[in-house]
Amino acid sequence: MAAKQVLFSDEARAKMLDGVNTLANAVKVTLGPKGRNVVLDKAYGAPTITKDGVSVAKEIELEDKFENMGAQIVKEVASKTADVAGDGTTTATVLAQALLTEGLKAVAAGMNPMDLKRGIDKAAAKLVEELKVLSKPCSDTKSIEQVGTISANSDSTVGKLIAEAMAKVGKEGVITVEEGKGFEDELDVVEGMQFDRGYLSPYFATNQENMTTDLESPYILLVDKKISNIRELLPVLEGVSKSGKALLIIAEDVESEALATLVVNNMRGVVKVCAVKAPGFGDRRKAMLEDIAILTGATVISEDLGMKLEEANMEHLGTASRVQVSKDDTTIIDGAGNKDAIVNRVNQLKANVAEATSDYDKEKLQERLAKLSGGVAVIRVGAVTEAEMKEKKDRVDDALHATRAAVEEGIVAGGGVALIRAQKALDGLVGDNDDQNHGIALLKKAIEAPLRQIVSNAGGESSVVVNEVKAKEGNYGYNAANDTYGDMVEMGILDPTKVTRSALQHAASIAGLMITTEAMVAEIKEDAPAMPMGGMGGMPGMM
C-alpha cells in the first residue's frame, strides 16, 4: 500500500478551497447572457468550445491531490444539479464557492463548524419553502418559450423550437436533440415510442462518445420469456445476417451465455445486434410488448400462445426506420406497423383509461397511450462548423431540460432575482446559538452571488446592481443582456423553480460538508525514476 500524506484543519481547508476556486473560476465565467466561452482541449480532434458549466467542470482535474479533492467535490454539485434539473450547474457552483469562502473564514475565526452547518441547513430549508411560494405555474407556450430562450443563453430560436416541440408531442412526450445536416435548426415530429430499458451490455454501443446504440432500419424481435440458449435464436440470427440489417431483441432477459455470444457476434460484425429487457413487469410487460408489436408490425413470441422461439422466422419480426438505445432507455422511431391497428390500439387504451378505477392504473395506461400516440419530436441543430454544432447542441440540451423542469415545478423570476427575493424569509429565522445564526447569515449573503456574477460577466459593478434590486420588490431585477432594470417576468427572463431549488440545495449540502472537514488524506506522489542512459555505440571494426 502506498504511503499517504495527511493534512489537518486550516491547512487542509485552505488547499481544498484553492481547488474549489480553480474549478469555480473556470465555470462561473459562463454565467448569464454575457457569459464567456471556455475552450476545452480534447485528446482527439478539435477543441470543444462551450458555455455549459457542467461540461467545463467535468474536464477539470488538478495536479495537486488535495486541491483536486476540493475541485472534485464541487464538480459533484454541478453534476448532481444537472442530473436532477438538467440546468443550473453554474449557479450551483457559484453558490457553493461563495458559501465555502465565507464559511471557512468563520471556521478560521474560531466558530464551531457543526453549528455553522446546522445554520446553513436551516436557512436552505427555509429558502426552498419561500421559492415554492414565489413559484408560478408554467403551462402556456409563451412561458415555455421564454424559459427555453434564457436557458439557451438568450437564443430565441431555440426557445421557439422547444415550445413548438412540446406543443406537438405534449409536455410528457419524448423530445430528442440531434446534429442537423444544414445551417438552420429544424423540428421533426416522427411517430415513435420510448421505454425505460437500456442495452444489456455496453459492448452493444455503436457511438462511443455518448455510449448509445444507433440502429438504422433494424428488424425487431419480441420475446415474452428469458433467452437462455443461443441455439433458440439461430434461425432468426441467420436470416437477419443474410439481409445485412441490424436486429433489436426485446426479451424478458438474456442470460449470460446467450448474451456473450450476441456481444461477440456484434463486435466481429457477423450481425449487428442489440438486446434490451422488455419494459414493465408481469401483465403490464405483456401489454407493453403487444404495444411495441402493433407499432412495429412484429409478432410477440409467447409460450402462452403456443409459440417457441426456435420456430420464429423473419415473418415474425417487426421493423422501424431507426432505433436508438442508451444505457437507460430505448426509442423506436417510425415503426412499420399497420396504421389502422395502431389507431384501434390507441382507442382501446383510451377506453381502458376511462374505465380504470385506481390512479396508478390510470397513470400507467396514460403513459402507454402517450408513447403510442404522441410520437417523438426531433430537434435538429444547424451550424456552420463542427465546433459551433457541439456548443449549440449542448445549449439546446440544457434548454430542453430547463423547460421540462419549468413545466414540472413552475417558474420564478430569473437573473438571480428569485434568490434575492427569498432572502426576506430568513429575516425572522433564529438558530439555537450565535454560530448557527452566523451560518444563516452566511447563506443569506451567499445567495446574492449568482446575481453578482451575472453583473460582473456583463462588465457592471455588482454591488450597485445588487443594492438597486434589493431596494425594490416583486420581480424587479437587472437585465444584463441590455443593461436595464425592470420586471423580469415581463421581459421574459425566467428560471425554472426546480433548477434554482436544486442549485441551492446541492450547494448548501456540499458546502456544509466541506466546512466540517478537519483532515484530508491522499497518496504521496512518487517521482518516476529517471531512465538509465542508453549504451554507447560500438566502434567500427578496424582493419
Curated annotation (Swiss-Prot):
Its EC number is 5.6.1.7. It holds the Pfam family Cpn60_TCP1. Disulfide bonds: none annotated. The keyword Protease does not apply. Gene3D superfamilies: GroEL (3.50.7.10), GroEL-like equatorial domain (1.10.560.10), TCP-1-like chaperonin intermediate domain (3.30.260.10). Coiled coil: none annotated. It is found in: Cytoplasm. Keywords: ATP-binding, Chaperone, Cytoplasm, Isomerase, Nucleotide-binding. One of its GO terms (biological process) is protein refolding. It catalyses: ATP + H2O + a folded polypeptide = ADP + phosphate + an unfolded polypeptide. It is an enzyme of class 5 (isomerase). One of its GO terms (cellular component) is cytoplasm. InterPro entries: Chaperonin_Cpn60_CS (IPR018370), Cpn60/GroEL (IPR001844), Cpn60/GroEL/TCP-1 (IPR002423), GroEL-like_apical_dom_sf (IPR027409), GROEL-like_equatorial_sf (IPR027413), TCP-1-like_intermed_sf (IPR027410). It comes from the Bacteria. Together with its co-chaperonin GroES, plays an essential role in assisting protein folding. The GroEL-GroES system forms a nano-cage that allows encapsulation of the non-native substrate proteins and provides a physical environment optimized to promote and accelerate protein folding. NCBIfam families: GroEL (TIGR02348), PRK00013.1 (NF000592), PRK12849.1 (NF009487), PRK12850.1 (NF009488), PRK12851.1 (NF009489). Forms a cylinder of 14 subunits composed of two heptameric rings stacked back-to-back. Interacts with the co-chaperonin GroES. Belongs to the chaperonin (HSP60) family. This is Chaperonin GroEL. The gene is groEL.
